[in-house]
């Protein structure tokens, strides 16, 4: 008789719970940031007049303009390659206070100095940003040779594991 009760309890437990499910944290993001040039290398290319390639290492901070917790008050780093205003691309790294990181790659689509416009795409992350995807646009304005502000607008999705939930049936 006791075996029957144990079997019934196990069967009930198995039908009222599920394995971890995948949920998703998603939203719209409006980030405002400031960057300073930490390191810059300029390389002259002699194939045409005034052709230079710049490699920039920038460091700064970004906050969520809507006050939401996503990438709010985070460190903001950029590694960029700019080819005489013809092309520009690189990588953005956002680091939250808890150490979680979100990574993005970007491409400049319009260059009218001191303003650069382009697109970015989240490529992954660590900690709470593991598996992040999404994309958006940016508008960067150089205030001097060492300082810029950047406005980013886009959407993101972050998969999150949800512990076994009770079956409501």
Regions found by a protein language model. Give the residues of each.
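Positively charged n-region of N-terminal signal peptides that target proteins for export
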Residues: 1-5
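Beta-strand-enriched cores of mature, soluble protein domains
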Residues: 22-169
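Bacterial N-terminal signal peptides
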Residues: 7-18
């Amino acid at each position: 008789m006791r075996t029957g009760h144990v079997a019934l309890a196990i069967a009930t437990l198995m039908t009222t719970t599920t394995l971890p499910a995948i949920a998703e944290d998603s939203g719209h993001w409006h980030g405002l940031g400031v960057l300073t040039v930490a390191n810059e290398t300029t390389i002259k290319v002699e194939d045409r007049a005034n052709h230079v390639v710049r490699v920039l290492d920038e460091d700064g901070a970004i906050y969520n303009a809507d006050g939401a917790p996503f990438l709010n008050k985070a460190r903001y780093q950029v590694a960029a390659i700019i080819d005489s205003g013809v092309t520009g691309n690189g990588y953005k790294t956002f680091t939250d206070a808890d150490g979680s990181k979100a990574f993005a790659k970007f491409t400049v689509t319009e260059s009218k100095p001191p303003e650069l416009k382009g697109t970015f795409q989240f490529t992954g992350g660590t900690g709470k940003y593991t598996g992040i995807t999404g994309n958006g646009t940016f508008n960067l304005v150089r205030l001097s040779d060492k300082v810029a502000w950047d406005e980013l607008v886009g959407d993101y999705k972050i998969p999150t594991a949800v512990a076994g939930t009770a079956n409501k049936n």
